Amino acid sequence: MSYPLSVEKDGIKIKPEQMKPETIYHCIFQNKIFIIYKDHGEILNCYEIEEEEIISKVKASNKENIEKILEEYIEKENLNRQ
């Protein structure tokens, strides 16, 4: 299965049919991180991160570390999924 997010010059293309519920997906577009996930009710949720420190960490990290960085950010900002 391919990654359900792709970045194009016009924006982010999302393929919700490829998303697993409660799984976090991310991409970087226009120097912002977008965190997108589909909840158990099939509703898409999106968060935009503009903090340069987090963006720099994500750009410099591998996949496993990116997930940890984003999970820590979500917890710190109290964006926990319901």
Regions inferred by a protein language model and the residue ranges of each:
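Negatively charged, low-complexity tracts enriched in Asp/Glu with abundant Ser/Thr
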Residues: 1-25
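Generic short amphipathic/hydrophobic targeting helices enriched at N-termini
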Residues: 3, 8-10, 45, 62-65, ...
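Acidic, low-complexity, intrinsically disordered interaction modules
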Residues: 16-61
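Mixed-charge, Lys/Arg-enriched low-complexity segments
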Residues: 49-82
